[in-house]
């Protein structure tokens, strides 16, 4: 189900590397509205995954562990650690403070100018084949430069001050809230316009003792119309929806 959620495609049944699905709608959006932001898209999750081998009824784990597919053969793994998400959004700084961000952007630009100048001087002494390789490298550097310019234009955005997280919070509820805060800031700063957030990998069997449900989530979904199991599954659904209010 997870593999089809945003693709609308029945994935190929395989436990091997020959996976095949479809491009997900978030990545279609990223190809359009993601071109003008530093990050075309952001893939987030709240549970560690396995990306190899079989996970369910002859299907590869790749189908269970993400809902984002860049192409029919390219699943995009999600990031679960809020600290790494913060660093991807704001670099290796410790805060969203605008003064700190502006200083870091100037440092990045100075370094980029040095790299471009050095590479252009080197080009005069290279043969044709190496110059082509250098040209490809410079194209990549200029893409970085473009993204830095986009970031600089956004650095004046009024953002809530958020310090770099230490890592994954101890509870599911805190994890949801922190990831939601990061998504909100990413949207406010226009660092990306496309985000997927997967609460649990398919068949993940998370339990919800905080709301009095010790049963594994996936197991409850096979309730066989048992009223007690259906009631506990409903509690989980309500809990998930209630947490959206924080976002």
Feature annotation, model-predicted:
Residues 1-247:
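Ligand-binding pockets and gating/stacking loops
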